[in-house]
């Protein structure tokens, strides 16, 4: 069975009180529409058609991809009208309708719904709620068969008492869709063309309406304002936390933990409070992450330790290495096994060999540091001349004294030592000691300046 997916994303979202189109508001670091597209792709459809309207150019710009077909809805005349705009592009056997502001929908739920769809059967996703205010109500006959959906504003008191609501997510036989779209009417309280009216048409045409429900009602929760957006955010984070804990991660407090990307984890991982994981993060077995850390697009090998208040982006920490507290690893930073980065150390495009140590108060940029090398406190690689970047290379077993300035391009060869306070501008040969500082001069009888007395 071939599949086309239509995602409705044309709404303005006036209750957001924002210049940003509603579907671009983020949940867990990705736009709501981005989450829906991600789920849609996992169903491997032959086409994904995104119906856009308000802020159309910005939506195109943010989400442009070869596998997306953007369809313009110039006037927002209802969900039925929106789907009708995509009709000319639909060629598959089945059409699945999704919503760009319903980001938590699970792929497994959609797969169950699609299994209900066929030439003679329409799949409808419903949800049972204690308070279904705002939802269209599912009307069933005495045999329990769905006969219609009545929108909340059009429902009478008896219909409003129904707890089963319409999510709007449908799996439809494409061969019948054009006919149903042509028969839609806007004779209702909203003056809009409701997609839900196809349910009654399908029943009249002899089709069965088969329903499915999500395991969690929050899967089908939309966001019309920022309060609802925050509820989606927190639910997503708790769901991701449960997923990671099921895979062997200890979260000190799942309510104080955020995932904003794709996270792969091993077993016996410990994550403390207020940790944010962004982008693609790989965490292997026995890793420990202290409180208040931000880790983005980074790989943490087995047994690595990230201490409190550290910020890592585009980095790789090797097996048994450690960083922090208050460490910053910028893109291109690589720590080999058992390398150590201490407090208030910043690395950028720097490679630390196995067992290398950078204890504290140091900046290393565009640097290659050999195994077992020790970098003293206050060391800085001077890698930028105002126009170009240059590299600093240190061999194995180098000892850099405290408060050194290493003016790149420069090489300090294996086993060399630099004295504290040195400014190194030339190659230091293997095993040599480099002393590059002014000789101390003491001035006897010197008197400190005195403050001028005010008249």
UniProtKB/Swiss-Prot annotation:
Positions annotated to bind Mg(2+): 101, 224
Q: Which InterPro entries match?
A: Bifunctional_GlmU, GlmU-like, GlmU_C_LbH, Hexapep, MobA-like_NTP_Trfase, Nucleotide-diphossugar_trans, Trimer_LpxA-like_sf
Q: Which reaction does it catalyse?
A: alpha-D-glucosamine 1-phosphate + acetyl-CoA = N-acetyl-alpha-D-glucosamine 1-phosphate + CoA + H(+); N-acetyl-alpha-D-glucosamine 1-phosphate + UTP + H(+) = UDP-N-acetyl-alpha-D-glucosamine + diphosphate
Q: Which UniProt keywords apply?
A: Acyltransferase, Cell shape, Cell wall biogenesis/degradation, Cytoplasm, Magnesium, Metal-binding, Multifunctional enzyme, Nucleotidyltransferase, Peptidoglycan synthesis, Repeat, Transferase
Which residues are UDP-N-acetyl-alpha-D-glucosamine-binding? 8-11, 22, 73, 78-79, 99-101, 136, 151, 166, 224, 330, 348, 363, 374
The segments labelled N-acetyltransferase in the record are: 248-455
- Pfam families found in the cross-reference section: Hexapep (PF00132), Hexapep_2 (PF14602), NTP_transf_3 (PF12804)
Q: In which pathway does it act?
A: Nucleotide-sugar biosynthesis; UDP-N-acetyl-alpha-D-glucosamine biosynthesis; N-acetyl-alpha-D-glucosamine 1-phosphate from alpha-D-glucosamine 6-phosphate (route II): step 2/2; Nucleotide-sugar biosynthesis; UDP-N-acetyl-alpha-D-glucosamine biosynthesis; UDP-N-acetyl-alpha-D-glucosamine from N-acetyl-alpha-D-glucosamine 1-phosphate: step 1/1; Bacterial outer membrane biogenesis; LPS lipid A biosynthesis
Entry GO CC: cytoplasm; membrane
Q: Which GO terms describe its molecular function?
A: glucosamine-1-phosphate N-acetyltransferase activity; magnesium ion binding; UDP-N-acetylglucosamine diphosphorylase activity
Q: Which GO terms describe its biological process?
A: cell morphogenesis; cell wall organization; lipid A biosynthetic process; peptidoglycan biosynthetic process; regulation of cell shape; UDP-N-acetylglucosamine biosynthetic process
Span list, region Pyrophosphorylase: 1-226
Keyword hit for Cell wall biogenesis/degradation: yes
Note on how the cofactor is bound: Binds 1 Mg(2+) ion per subunit.
Q: Where is the active site?
A: 360 (proton acceptor)
Q: How does this polypeptide assemble, per the annotation?
A: Homotrimer.
Protein name in the entry:
Bifunctional protein GlmU
Which classification does the entry list for the species? Bacteria, Pseudomonadati, Pseudomonadota, Gammaproteobacteria, Pseudomonadales
- The gene that this protein is the product of is glmU
């Amino acid at each position: 069975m071939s599949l086309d997916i239509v995602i409705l994303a044309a709404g303005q979202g006036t209750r957001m009180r924002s210049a940003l189109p509603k579907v671009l508001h983020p949940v867990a670091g990705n736009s709501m529409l981005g989450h829906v597209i991600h789920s849609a792709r996992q169903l491997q459809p032959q086409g994904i058609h995104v119906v856009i309207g308000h802020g159309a150019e910005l939506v195109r710009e943010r989400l442009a991809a070869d596998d997306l077909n953007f369809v313009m809805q110039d006037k927002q005349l209802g969900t039925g009208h929106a789907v009708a705009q995509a009709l000319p592009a639909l060629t598959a056997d089945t059409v699945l309708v999704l919503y760009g502001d319903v980001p938590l929908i699970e792929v497994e739920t959609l797969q169950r719904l699609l299994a209900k769809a066929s030439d003679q059967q329409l799949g409808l996703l419903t949800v049972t709620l204690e308070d279904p205010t705002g939802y269209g109500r599912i009307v069933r006959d005495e045999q329990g068969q769905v006969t219609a959906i009545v929108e909340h504003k059009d429902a009478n008191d008896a219909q409003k008492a129904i707890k089963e609501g319409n999510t709007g997510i449908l799996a439809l036989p494409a061969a019948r869709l054009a006919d149903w779209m042509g028969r839609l009417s806007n004779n209702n309280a909203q003056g809009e063309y409701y997609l839900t009216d196809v349910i009654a048409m399908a029943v009249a045409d002899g089709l069965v309406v088969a329903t499915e429900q999500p395991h969690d009602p929050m899967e089908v929760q939309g966001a019309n304002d920022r309060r609802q957006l925050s509820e989606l955010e927190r639910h997503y984070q708790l769901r991701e936390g449960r997923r990671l804990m099921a895979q062997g991660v200890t979260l000190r407090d799942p309510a104080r933990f955020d995932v904003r990307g794709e996270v792969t984890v091993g077993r016996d991982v410990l994550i403390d409070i207020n940790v944010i994981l962004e982008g693609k993060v790989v965490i292997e077995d026995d890793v420990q992450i202290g409180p208040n850390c931000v880790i983005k697009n980074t790989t943490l090998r087995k047994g690595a330790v990230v201490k409190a208040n550290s910020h890592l982006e585009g980095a790789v920490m090797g097996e048994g290495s450690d960083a922090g507290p208050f460490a910053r690893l910028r893109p291109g930073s690589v720590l080999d096994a058992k390398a150590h980065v201490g407090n208030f150390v910043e690395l950028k495009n720097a490679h630390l060999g196995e067992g290398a140590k950078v204890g504290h108060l140091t900046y290393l940029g565009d640097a290659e540091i050999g195994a077992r090398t020790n970098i003293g406190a206050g060391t800085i690689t001077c890698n930028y001349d105002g126009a170009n970047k240059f590299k600093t290379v240190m061999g194995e077993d180098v000892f850099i004294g405290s408060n050194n300035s290493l003016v790149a391009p420069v090489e300090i060869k294996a086993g060399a030592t630099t004295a504290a306070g040195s400014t190194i501008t030339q190659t230091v040969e293997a095993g040599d000691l480099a002393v590059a500082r002014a000789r101390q001069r003491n001035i006897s009888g010197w008197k400190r300046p005195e403050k001028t007395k005010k008249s």
